[in-house]
Amino acid sequence: DKNQNTIDTNKYSSTILEESADAGQSYVDETLFLGDSNTARMYRIFNYCSYDNAIGSVGMSGKSLATYACVQFQGYSGYKTMPEAVALMQPRRVILTFGTNDLSSSYSASSFASDYANGIKAVQDAYPSVDIIVNAIPPLGQQHSNQNLTQTQVDEYNKALVQMCQDNGWKFLNSAEVLKDSSTGYAKSGYVLSSDGIHLTCLLYTSDAADE
């Protein structure tokens, strides 16, 4: 049932970010985007962001957020974790998009949310004044290359994420609902690559930029 794990927007009205008018380039400039390959694609391919305000690590999972050293800074030796990077870059807010690489039939939504929360708390500990916004895991295409991934589990994880945000006083960006085709419950046509049904396309980033 594609509606089985629909998020109750009334229950989480104080947690889910409401749609708002374009906040302008200054909002983007004050924001640090953290995430997996979909975030990496934002600046490596589509120029939606720059290396100054986005850190994306291909294949990275939410559960490794606190510990995985993947960021290099000029003047510093070795690699830094994302929490360490936040402390160095000092953004006004971070928008985190993880979860696609955590999906597994042996990894429950509650375990995922708990592990991910530990990573987000590490970000807060590293730079306490930062505002936390957790982005939903994007939907899959109806045809996708990894048959171990299911849209049902994506929905379960997102439902756990909004509860995690409410429990911790963080904001939740329910972008998945905008990207979904309401008739199928999967990603709208053209919003994920036809080659794998997982990675977001340029069309989506262009639409996002127009809608912000």
Predicted ranges, named:
Residues D1-V28:
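N-terminal, intrinsically disordered, polar/charged segments of Gram-positive cell-envelope systems
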Residues A21-S114:
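Conserved SGNH/GDSL esterase-like catalytic core that processes O-acyl groups on lipids
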Residues T31-F33, R93-T97, D131-A136, K171-N174:
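Structural recognition of the beta-strand scaffold that forms the well-ordered cores
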Residues S37-R41, T100-S104, P138-Q142, E177-D181, ...:
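Solvent-exposed loop/turn segments at secondary-structure junctions
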Residues T100-N101, Q124-D155:
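Active-site segments of SGNH/GDSL-like serine hydrolases
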Residues N101-S110, N146-Q151, L193-L200:
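Second-shell loop/turn segments in exported
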Residues L140-S175, I198:
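Substrate-gating cap/lid alpha-helix
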Residues Y205-E212:
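Conserved small/polar residues in nucleotide/adenosyl-binding loops
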